[in-house]
Swiss-Prot record:
EC number(s) stated in the UniProt entry for this protein: 4.2.1.49
Cofactor notes: Binds 1 NAD(+) per subunit.
Family: Belongs to the urocanase family.
Protein name: Urocanate hydratase
Compartment list: Cytoplasm
Source organism of this protein record: Vibrio atlanticus (strain LGP32)
Functional description taken from the UniProt entry: Catalyzes the conversion of urocanate to 4-imidazolone-5-propionate.
Keyword set includes Cytoplasm: yes
Annotated InterPro entries: Urocanase (IPR055351), Urocanase-like (IPR023637), Urocanase_C (IPR035401), Urocanase_central_sf (IPR038364), Urocanase_CS (IPR023636), Urocanase_N (IPR035400), Urocanase_Rossmann-like (IPR035085), Urocanase_sf (IPR036190)
Amino acid sequence: MTEHHNSDPRLDTTREIRAPHGTTLRAKSWLTEAPLRMLMNNLDPDVAEHPHALVVYGGIGRAARDWKCYDKIVEVLERLEDDQTLLVQSGKPVGVFPTHKNAPRVLIANSNLVPHWANWEHFNELDKEGLMMYGQMTAGSWIYIGSQGIVQGTYETFVAIAKKHFQGEANGKWVLTGGLGGMGGAQPLAATMAGFSMIAVECDESRIDYRLRTGYVDRKATSIDEAMAMIKESDTPISVGLLGNAADVFPELVERNITPDVVTDQTSAHDPLNGYLPQGWTMEKAAQERTIDEAKVVKAAKQSMAIQVQAMLDLQYRGAATVDYGNNIRQMALEEGVENAFDFPGFVPAYIRPLFCEGVGPFRWAALSGDPEDIYKTDQKVKELIPDNPHLHNWLDMARERIQFQGLPARICWVGLKDRERLGQAFNEMVKNGELKAPVVIGRDHLDSGSVASPNRETEGMMDGSDAVSDWPLLNALLNTAGGATWVSLHHGGGVGMGFSQHSGMVICCDGSEDASQRISRVLHNDPATGVMRHADAGYDIAKQCAKEQKLDLPMLNEELRRL
C-alpha cells in the first residue's frame, strides 16, 4: 500500500498505474483478469486525463472512488472465484456474493440518485463526504480506450454533416469547436479524417500539447489570426488547437464577421463546477474559487456558456451548420436566459439516429495481451466478415494509419445487430486457436442505441415523445446481466450531467472457451437488439424493418412486423 501524501484520499501523486501485458495472470482466471486489466488501463497515464486523482475523462469521471477503494477492488479481483460476483457502488467495492460461472463477475452502479435529488448540488455534497463518485460513461465502467473511443462516432457525424450540408465535399471547409479533453480531443483527428479543417479552442495548454504529441491535433496557435492563417495556408485539411476560452473566441468571431462552415462544442459544459472555465478567469483562479464558493463558480461558468451559445446561434443565423455535440451546453444556456438555445439540433437526432435504429453503435474491443498485432489481426477479420462495406474498411485503414494506441491496444468500429455477435464469435475462435496471444474484451460506450435515456442527447426528439423514459437502459442492464456479460454497469449523469441521463454498459471477455461462445451469442445479440426494440417501439420504420429481418420477438409489434 502506498502512503497518501495529501489529505484528499482521491489524490496520490506517487501512483502510476499501467495494465499488465502478456499471459501471466494476477487474477484466478481471464474472466477476472479482464476487469482488473481494464480498470488499470483506465488509469494508465497515457489514457487518463488526471490519473493521480483517479480521473479518467469528462470533468471528474473517475475509475474508483478513492485510492483505498481502488486498492481494495484490485485485491478482490485477484482473489475472486468464477462463481462469485463483486458489487461496486459508485467506485467502492461493497460486497462479494455467490452466483454462478455464467453470471457477470462484476456488477457496477455509479452516480445513481433518486430523481428528486438528482442534481449537481446534492451530488457534490455526497462526493465531498466520500459517499459517491461520478462515473461518467466508460470511466467508472472500466472500458475507456482513450480518445479513439469517440473518434469514429465523431468522424461519422462529420461525414454526415458533409453529406447533408456540402454535397459530401468537406475539403476547403472548416469546423469551429471548443474542448480538447478526453472526449473533445477526438474532434480534430475526426474532422481531418472526414476532410474538414478545424480550429479547436482549449483553455488548458497542456491538453493541446498532449493532443499534439499523440497526433490528434496538427498545430498550436495562440491567436485567432494565427489559427486562421494556418488553415488558409494549408493545401490539405489541418487541425489547430487554439489556446483560449471558447466564451471569448466564439463571440469574437461573430464580431469580426468570420463565419465557420460548421460549429459545435465539446467543452465539459455538463459539469459547470469542474468542467468549464468562466470568461476572464485563469485556471488557477477557478481552482481556488472552487474551494471557497462553489455556487459562484457554477454561476460564472453558466453565464459564460450562455455567451458561447449565443455566439453559436449567431453563427448559425449567418449560415454555419451548427450542432450540439452532447455536453448539455444548450440546457445550461437556457437556464441562464438564452430562450432559443435549442434552436440548433443535437447531433444524434440530426445525424446518428438512423444508425441507432439498426442497432449500429460504438462497438469496441481491447487486446489484453498488450500486443498491437492482436488488434491488426482482428481488423483483418472484421474486413473478411464484412466484405461489402467500403466505408468501414476505409475507417479501419485510417484508424491503423493515424490513431496511436493509448494503453492496451484497442479498436472502435461502428457495427450493428447484424454483425456484433458474428465478430465476437470470430474473435473468441481466434483466441481459442492461438491466432491471438491472449483474450480480448468487447465492450461499448454507454452512448449506444438501447442503453441510454438522455433527452438532451441520445434520446432527444424521439418521434413518440418518450425522450425521458429511462426504463430502457435499466432493461438493457438487466438483460446483459441475465445473458452473462463479464461486467455490467448502470450509471446516471454521464455526458450531460446530473439529472439529465441514465445509461448502462457491458463488457464481455472472449477467452476462447465454449462457455464464452455461448455467452457471446446471447449478449452480443441481445445488447444491440434492445436498441432496435427501443426505436421500433417508438415508431421508427427503419427499426421495425430491422426487427423483422433479424426475427426479433416484439409482442406488441409482431403483427405489424409480419405485414411489412
